[in-house]
Regions:
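A short beta-strand-turn-helix
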Residues: 5-24, 65
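Short pre-active-site segment immediately N-terminal to redox-active cysteine/selenocysteine motifs
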Residues: 21-22, 28-32, 75
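N-terminal targeting signals for export/organelle localization
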Residues: 1-4, 109
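Non-catalytic, surface beta->alpha helical segment in thiol-disulfide oxidoreductase systems
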Residues: 83-109
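Structural microenvironment flanking redox-active thiols in thiol-disulfide oxidoreductases
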Residues: 59-67
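Conserved redox-active cysteine motifs that mediate thiol-disulfide chemistry
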Residues: 28-42
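Structural alpha/beta surface segment adjacent to cysteine/selenocysteine redox centers
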Residues: 67-76, 80-88, 94
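Conserved helix-turn-beta segment immediately C-terminal to the redox Cys motif
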Residues: 21-23, 38-59
Length: 109
């Protein structure tokens, strides 16, 4: 995984996501999930392209089950975009890079 992608856990979620001074895109995933693996290159590309403007992270739902339950994650992949500590966009299923970029750009205006 790219060094630009932050590993998010139940333990660091508040600091990395809710208290971040820039928007944060969190990919809720699991290793056994085929569609989640399809998103890996897209997530890594977005992390590089938006470095310094948006924090991009991944949270493994198998190893961290408190945070997904707080945000009503019932299917993966789910991507949630957070801004100022609030979930502002929730997308379930595999999304195109174009769709994810549009969601990010809307929050950067």
């Amino acid at each position: 995984m790219s060094e630009d992608v932050v590993i998010i856990t139940d333990g660091n979620f508040d600091g990395e996501v809710l208290k971040s001074n820039i928007p944060v895109l969190v990919d809720f995933w699991a290793a056994w999930c085929g569609p989640c693996r399809q998103l890996v290159p897209v997530i890594e590309e977005l992390a590089k392209e938006y470095k310094g403007k948006v924090k991009v992270g991944k949270l493994d739902t198998e190893e961290n089950n408190n945070t997904p339950s707080k945000f009503g994650i019932t299917a993966i992949p789910t991507i949630i975009l957070f801004k100022n500590g609030q979930a502002v966009n929730k997308m379930v299923g595999v999304k195109s890079k174009k769709d994810l970029k549009a969601a990010l750009e809307a929050q950067l205006k």
